[in-house]
A protein has these predicted regions:
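Enzymes that bind and transform nitrogen-containing heteroaromatic metabolites
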Residues: 1-170
Length: 170
């Protein structure tokens, strides 16, 4: 019997204090984390909130971008499809073997219960932010760490960070 459950993955970078953004941009620059993001998400559909889609540093999928919005006729970047709810996005992507949820904070909070994978880059620092990952909702006992790569600061990365991949325990 073939497993037809899609891989629904949250992907984010968060600081030790949960910071994921300030004024609709990332609080840090981590080129190797961007490269990891592009590598694991290549060719996969994305789901994100409207503000994330409109961010200056937004990365859009070359496959499909579903944008969660309550607005009837939102101004969105080309190639983006508005959807009224996460449930509707999941319905539209039911045939996809894998798709990614990119945030922001409110979307992550809604999506945690349905996600079965988590790509979490943990940035070793505390940052001023106005958007935070909902760590308080994450039940760590439900997640198994599959892979972790730690990076120390260098000439391209001001902060240490760890790229972690988790799978929800069955």
């Amino acid at each position: 019997v073939q497993n037809t459950t899609p891989k629904v993955a949250l992907i984010t970078a968060a600081a030790l204090n949960g910071a994921i953004g300030i004024e609709n941009r990332l609080p840090w620059q981590l080129p190797d984390d961007w490269a990891h993001f592009r590598r694991v998400t290549a060719g996969k559909p994305f789901v994100m909130g409207r503000k994330s889609a409109l961010a200056e540093d937004a990365l859009l999928s070359d496959t499909r971008n579903l944008i969660l919005t309550r607005q009837a006729q939102p101004a969105l970047p080309p190639g983006c499809e508005p959807v009224p709810s996460l449930e509707e996005a999941a319905r539209r992507l039911a045939h996809e073997p894998e798709w990614f949820i990119l945030g922001g904070a409110e979307v992550f909070a809604q999506a945690l219960p349905i996600a079965n994978y988590l790509y979490l880059t943990l940035v070793n620092g505390f940052f001023e932010a106005d958007a935070f990952f909902p760590f308080h909702q994450l039940r760590w006992a439900e997640w198994e760490l599959l892979h972790s790569v730690r990076r120390e600061p260098d000439d391209r990365h001001r902060w240490a960070f760890a790229i972690n991949e988790y799978q929800r325990r069955r």
